């Protein structure tokens, strides 16, 4: 548990790029789970290296790792119930350093994301990932070591606090405040946020602020190599933080400013 038992409420903003929204629009979510959990995984596939001209004398970990990557994608379609949210992504794949050498080791890194508050979906994915990786590796005479780390829980938004936030942002911004469920249909997003740890300790609301869309030349979303943010919205984000704090303290502690 975080040492924040003295905190009564928490609020955060995340910038959002590449969306066709007016710059500075504040998106306020509904209550419940709004963002997925996230966990890192690392798979190390070990074979036997050697010269590229003599593959018969080697055990190629690249081939095994490539088949593992493909096999893992079947977890979503063949093992999760329809409607269960689970995303398994390999974002990094490394093996070898020379074009004429079969390496000893191939490695994969990635993430697992679910919106299951009890993380049973995540447990299933972890179990099957380990079994699949080790089984496929063995089929290619390799071994596979699978490890998991850095679990971050789902973001949980407090519904009464979200309703407060919508009222406060409307007071401050008028039509610049938007109910995020109009875009999401009330479904959780697949992104993750470590502020979620706070949301499991105290009532929390996590909001987004539009930081540029196609009209501003910000055509790409988060983590795209060409992503751009319109930093003219920074003052608005600061004002929103301040206004939320002032209004919440007035409503809940009778503190007037």
Predicted segments with their positions:
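Histidine/acidic-residue-rich, glycine-tolerant segments that coordinate divalent metal ions
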Residues: 1-103, 192
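Metal-dependent amide/peptide-bond hydrolase catalytic core
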Residues: 66-257
């Amino acid at each position: 548990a975080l040492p924040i038992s003295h905190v009564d409420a928490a609020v955060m903003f995340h910038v959002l790029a590449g969306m066709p929204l007016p710059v500075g629009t504040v998106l306020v979510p509904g209550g419940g789970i709004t963002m997925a959990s996230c966990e890192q995984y690392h798979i190390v596939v070990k074979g036997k290296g050697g010269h590229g001209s003599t593959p018969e004398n080697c055990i190629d970990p690249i081939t095994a790792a490539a088949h593992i990557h493909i096999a893992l994608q079947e977890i979503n379609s063949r093992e999760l119930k329809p409607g269960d949210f689970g995303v398994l992504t390999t974002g990094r794949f490394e093996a070898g350093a020379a074009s004429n050498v079969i390496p000893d080791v191939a490695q994969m890194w990635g993430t697992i994301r679910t919106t299951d508050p009890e993380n049973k979906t995540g447990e299933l994915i972890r179990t099957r990932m380990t079994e699949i990786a080790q089984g496929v590796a063995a089929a290619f005479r390799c071994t596979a070591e699978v490890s998991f780390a850095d679990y971050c829980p789902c973001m949980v938004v407090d519904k009464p606090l979200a309703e407060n936030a919508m009222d406060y942002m409307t007071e401050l911004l008028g039509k610049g405040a938007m109910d995020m469920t109009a875009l999401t249909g009330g479904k959780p997003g697949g992104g993750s946020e470590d502020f979620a740890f706070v949301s499991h300790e105290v009532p929390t609301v996590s909001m987004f602020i539009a930081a540029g869309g196609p009209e501003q030349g910000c055509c790409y979303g988060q983590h795209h190599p060409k992503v751009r943010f319109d930093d003219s919205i920074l003052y608005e984000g600061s004002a929103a933080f301040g206004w939320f704090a002032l209004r919440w303290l007035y409503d809940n502690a009778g503190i007037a400013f």
